[in-house]
UniProtKB/Swiss-Prot annotation:
Residue ranges constituting the EngA-type G domain according to the UniProt record: 4-167, 175-351
Family: Belongs to the TRAFAC class TrmE-Era-EngA-EngB-Septin-like GTPase superfamily. EngA (Der) GTPase family.
Function description: GTPase that plays an essential role in the late steps of ribosome biogenesis.
PANTHER family in UniProt: GTPASE DER
Binding residues for GTP 1: 10-17, 57-61, 119-122
UniProt protein name: GTPase Der
Residues reported in the UniProt entry to bind GTP 2: 181-188, 229-233, 294-297
Residue span, KH-like domain: 352-436
GO terms for MF: GTP binding; ribosome binding
Heme in keyword set: no
UniProt keyword annotations, A-Z: GTP-binding, Nucleotide-binding, Repeat, Ribosome biogenesis
């Protein structure tokens, strides 16, 4: 599902990040404590009254070296470009400032709904001071203390009320994929080459985000695809377009909307920290993954080049051991014909279901090879396992005590399941549950 976007804006020190964390709460989860698997705190998923939304802390995107008003303008511009709903945070302690008025004028000219959150209203006596904020012309101010959690519910109610109506999903048989990576890795060239290679009739479809143009196409076998454009990547003249955090945010939004993610690496430049960061987010989100090394034609190669690259990738991306690696050239079209079929194969892995009887045979065989562990004289007992969902495939293993299921044994079972059923290109999740 494509989530609507809520952006938090406001001058420094009004409590934007505190409000962000209060709304996001514990919903930001690190699935595995593995080096390179991180989630950027400027982007999270919020939920209230059974409605989910993407949450952006624009303050996290600031260039701290930029002039004060440039930072403010920068935030407001991102919010206007990206958000369905804008939460404008001001400080009840300091009252209306020139910077607040500056942002209010920018936001007033947009057609986006704006919620005026007066933060740092830490005691009832201060509520009388919020009426000054009506002068900003943005409607009713919502008093809040994000530190204490006061008023957050009212702000969330207002957010939900102003979110756009939920949109229907694309045809379930459509495979949604995106190409992500640092600037200048050749994403645009790859997109154009893929479309040309498939000789498809591609039609631009207005995306659910403001500036996204997705490309819907059908291959020669009748399989439908939706190629998700990382919105705004091609826009020019934006001061913030080349900042890494903004690029990360764009990539994260594309990942959220994708079934399969193609991580594009520049063969000339090698693997960078950005690549691992984005790959970690896609892994956590349970997306299918392909590691695409582009500009392969520009490297001088010998008989060991491919093996060296594969070894380095496996070392740098240890959490992506399931992801296939493909070396391509958008310029010469080398191996591009293999990409659509690989995307399709990984989508099938993401949607694969294993009958419980067959799954439990594999689990029992695994236990015979490597008996369950013991702790303080008590042995882990596995009663049965079942698959509970797809995208990614998720399995629940019912046991006598959850605490006895050591991470290493869970990983062993995952490897046995992968050996039996392949699951190429997709993470799989195993969850231990105590049998009731």
């Amino acid at each position: 599902m494509v989530l609507p976007t809520v952006a938090i804006v406001g001058r420094p020190n009004v409590g934007k990040s505190t409000l962000f964390n209060r709304i996001a709460g514990e919903r930001i989860s690190i699935v595995e404590d593995v080096e390179g698997v991180t989630r950027d705190r400027i982007y999270a998923t919020g939920e209230w009254l059974n409605r989910k939304f993407s949450l952006i802390d624009t303050g996290g995107i600031d260039d701290v070296d930029a002039p004060f008003m440039e930072q403010i303008k920068h935030q407001a511009q991102i919010a206007m470009d990206e958000a369905d709903v804008i939460v404008f945070v001001v400080s009840g302690k300091e009252g209306v400032t020139d910077a607040d008025e500056y942002v209010a004028k920018m936001l007033y000219r947009t057609n986006k709904p704006v919620i005026l959150a007066v933060n740092k209203v830490d005691n009832p006596e201060m509520r009388n001071d919020i009426y000054d904020f009506y002068a900003l012309g943005l409607g009713d101010p919502y008093p809040a203390s994000s530190v204490h959690g006061i008023g957050t519910g009212d702000i969330l109610d207002a957010i939900i009320e102003k979110l756009p109506v939920e949109e229907e999903e694309i045809n379930d048989n459509t495979i949604r994929f995106s190409l992500i990576g640092r600037p200048n890795v050749g994403k645009s060239s790859l997109i154009n080459a893929i479309l040309g290679e498939e000789r498809v009739i591609a039609s631009p479809v207005a995306g659910t985000t403001r500036d996204a143009i997705d490309t819907h196409f059908t291959d020669q076998d009748g399989q439908e695809y939706n190629m998700i454009d990382t919105a705004g990547m091609r826009k020019s003249g934006k001061v913030y377009e080349n900042t890494e955090k903004y690029s990360v945010m764009r990539a994260m939004r594309a990942i959220d909307r994708s079934d399969v993610v193609l991580l594009v690496i520049n063969a000339e430049e090698g693997i960078r920290e950005y690549d691992k960061r984005i790959a970690g987010f896609a892994h956590e989100a349970g997306k299918g993954m392909i590691i695409v090394v582009n500009k392969w034609d520009l490297l001088e190669k010998d008989n060991h080049t491919v093996a060296k690259w594969e070894a380095d990738i496996r070392d740098q991306f240890q959490f992506l051991s399931y992801a296939p690696i493909i070396f391509v050239s958008a310029l010469t079209k080398q191996r591009l014909n293999k990409l659509p079929e690989l995307i399709k194969k990984i989508s099938e892995s993401q949607n694969k279901r294993i009958p419980s009887a067959v799954l439990n045979d594999v689990i029992m065989d695994a236990i015979a090879i490597n008996p369950t562990p013991t702790d303080k004289g008590k042995r882990l007992k596995i009663f049965y396992a079942t698959q509970v969902s797809v995208k990614p495939p998720t399995f629940v293993i019912f046991v006598n005590e959850e605490e006895l299921m050591h991470f290493s044994y869970l990983r062993f079972l995952e490897n046995q399941i992968r050996a039996a059923f392949t699951f190429e290109g997709t993470p799989i999740h195993l969850i231990a549950r105590k049998r009731k």
